[in-house]
């Protein structure tokens, strides 16, 4: 896989499950990051013929930075190894996921060629869906666009994972900087008049040309979101880093499905050591509809490495960076501003 792939299936329970297939090769990590921003669980694939790879490690760390809490590990190509090598692959995976959210995840060996293990995998996917927190409806829909194209006879189409609220046909929306109207909606290959959060959806739009939109844009309802070009956030610096995190560097933040060159200021100190937690202020090149609790991954493009990631704490910081000590408490927001908004308590 070079770019994102999309698929869906109906599980034995009748639950409908959507997949975002992300590329594994290091050269396409930016595409991987564009795809994982909207996921709630992971099907973590390791080829039994190859075992754990350096990119497996980076993908696992990225999923942890994004707050993913549940998943299933799948050992593919199991028909190409004997029983001893398959057992070694199991042990290899168990060693690497120890201490992570996948530590207690089921490991299923499968073969796409023979069909071995696929029924077991479908049962485990049902169990995964059952233990994964359902998307909540806050009445504020947001869809980070991961694909834009023009459909013959229909016009502009954007796709993404819907969160936060519902979309309906004929609804007015804002995508990036452009106002538009929803002509039609599709999910899992069928047309619908309304769609709820936690769903992969294709949105056919009128009033905007597909050339004016791009991956990383957000589709939202008008006048529901505060756009911000700076925010304070918690950050965890990866332990594997061989240097401290400072304000110096060519940083890129991956938020939703977007990739944004950012400036960074470490809060409360000058540096953060590998394996530690702290706070940062990030300055974006363009304003985005963010809210506290949104997750991000931080990379340093000069070194071509993942630095860490964290959670948005304050979408409208009022204190100078030298004085800021952000957290998600209402007390802190009221103390600094004297007021609080609905977005601050979500």
Region roles according to the model:
Residues 81-85, 95, 107, 208-346:
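C-terminal effector modules of nucleic-acid-centric enzymes and ribosome-associated factors
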Residues 1-3, 11-18, 38-46, 72, ...:
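Helix-rich terminal scaffold detector
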Residues 78, 95-241:
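Conserved catalytic-core segments of large NTP-driven translation/proteostasis enzymes
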Residues 25-26, 49-53, 68, 77-82, ...:
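Conserved nucleotide-binding/hydrolysis micro-motifs of P-loop NTPases
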Residues 30, 34, 44, 54-61, ...:
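Solvent-exposed alpha-helical segments within well-ordered globular domains of core cellular machineries
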Residues 16, 22-28, 36-88:
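Conserved Switch II/interswitch segment of TRAFAC-class P-loop GTPases
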